[in-house]
Amino acid sequence: MSQQVIIFDTTLRDGEQALQASLSAKEKLQIALALERMGVDVMEVGFPVSSPGDFESVQTIARTIKNSRVCALARCVEKDIDVAAQALKVADAFRIHTFIATSPMHIATKLRSTLDEVIERAVYMVKRARNYTDDVEFSCEDAGRTPVDDLARVVEAAINAGARTINIPDTVGYTMPFEFAGIISGLYERVPNIDKAIISVHTHDDLGIAVGNSLAAVHAGARQVEGAMNGIGERAGNCALEEVIMAIKVRKDIMNVHTNINHHEIWRTSQTVSQICNMPIPANKAIVGSGAFAHSSGIHQDGVLKNRENYEIMTPESIGLNQIQLNLTSRSGRAAVKHRMEEMGYKDTDYNMDHLYDAFLKLADKKGQVFDYDLEALAFINKQQEEPEHFRLDYFSVQSGSSDIATASVKLACGEEIKAEAANGNGPVDAIYQAINRLTGYDVELVKYDLNAKGQGKDALGQVDIVVNHHGRRFHGVGLATDIVESSAKAMVHVLNNIWRAAEVEKELQRKAQNKENNKETV
């Protein structure tokens, strides 16, 4: 019987640190639900002490997720651990993940401390975390550059203090696979109480070998792998979980371990993370890239036609990628659309059927035929924009030509009021953005604009993703339409709604803080 490798996802904590715009609480919950559906064992969803917004997000996810263990990060600082526990306590069970640097460089230059003092602090903080939960994980930051004898001392002390998972991070992506395996083997040889904890690894991709390091560590005895979907994360990214999961599945003959992941959900989860985080997946990305199962060489094509196993070590279907595309038309009823969504793996709670069917009919009238990729794009936008909107695009028109200055006229619902404005710009998109910004009075700077076709052919849906800077904060917006200018307008309206909602959340947090202060004064 093979042993289980625990899959620890840190997309919402370490992965989010790489994003140009922070995710909203709703977007984080959307990703958390996708990860739960995929079957991750543990999800690290934030760093609660970092901001009131992160605290609220962690609390919301902890209250909602039932089938994965929710975890929050805390430094070896009393307040960090106490705040993490406060955010997580709404969950039936939770994990606190605390960490401190252990390498000579970090101890000397960052902490300005000694190894003995680091061990003392680690022990105290692990014990403090154990006051809140028996599921405590301890990480030795920069373990890859920590002498193994020093590392063994820290690990033994942390286990004695009550840590049930010990994480060995290659924080800067420095070690080679054979080195990293040697570190894990060295700990098993040196730490007498190592059988009382699960050894975990957390690798970074600075040298392009994060997945290789994680797999080498598993082969050496590690039984938890930490990473992020699509490998997102700081600098060159984290270990790509989908790659580790499928490597373990495909090479079970030599790995002799398994995961409890529903691998048929990998494709959908990957797409969800990519779209919400506004991080496109490279075509040649292993497992989930659009070219991962493509064969262009004539020799390869011939071999695949004769037997797929000639050139495919796994199938698209094994990760939930259905390559058989069915089409629907405006004559297709609600039942047909609902049935197709179910066949693609969607549940009723994943989308609003009324809104989706309305958008489907409008698209079918324009395109004639609506394909699976169209439905998935509509469902994604439907989910992104289902919250109450303060701003709504009512009407727009654009006049533009090769030698004319572009002029846009826009009508926008701002709360209960309909406003109209016209503006010139350097092209139709800029003209529309000038008009919208005049209407709302928001001072935003466009820092990123991406256009991607969702589907094939000249009538494909165009998805526009934008990132804007507003008073030092970055916000993401998305729009979808067969018309690129309309997609662009919708993306700007979406981003302005996100800014408005963020301001409302900030007001609510301030109100709660003021009420708490008033209650203290009353007592």
UniProtKB/Swiss-Prot annotation:
Enzyme nomenclature, EC number: 2.3.3.13
Domain Pyruvate carboxyltransferase: 5-267
Binding site for Mn(2+): D14, H202, H204, N238
Entry's Gene Ontology BP terms: L-leucine biosynthetic process
Pfam families linked: HCS_D2, HMGL-like, LeuA_dimer
Cellular component GO terms held in the UniProt record: cytosol
Pathway the protein takes part in: Amino-acid biosynthesis; L-leucine biosynthesis; L-leucine from 3-methyl-2-oxobutanoate: step 1/4
Enzyme's top EC category: transferase
Keywords: Amino-acid biosynthesis, Branched-chain amino acid biosynthesis, Cytoplasm, Leucine biosynthesis, Manganese, Metal-binding, Transferase
Location in or out of the cell: Cytoplasm
Catalytic activity: 3-methyl-2-oxobutanoate + acetyl-CoA + H2O = (2S)-2-isopropylmalate + CoA + H(+)
Annotated stretches, region: Regulatory domain: 392-523
GO molecular function, a single term: acetyl-CoA C-acetyltransferase activity
Cofactor(s) in the UniProt record: Mn(2+)
SUPFAM superfamilies: 2-isopropylmalate synthase LeuA, allosteric (dimerisation) domain, Aldolase
PROSITE patterns in UniProt: AIPM_HOMOCIT_SYNTH_1, AIPM_HOMOCIT_SYNTH_2, PYR_CT
Main location: cytoplasm
UniProt record similarity statement: Belongs to the alpha-IPM synthase/homocitrate synthase family. LeuA type 1 subfamily.
Subunit structure: Homodimer.
Stated role: Catalyzes the condensation of the acetyl group of acetyl-CoA with 3-methyl-2-oxobutanoate (2-ketoisovalerate) to form 3-carboxy-3-hydroxy-4-methylpentanoate (2-isopropylmalate).
Protein name from the UniProt record: 2-isopropylmalate synthase
The organism of origin for this protein: Salmonella agona (strain SL483)
Gene of this entry: leuA
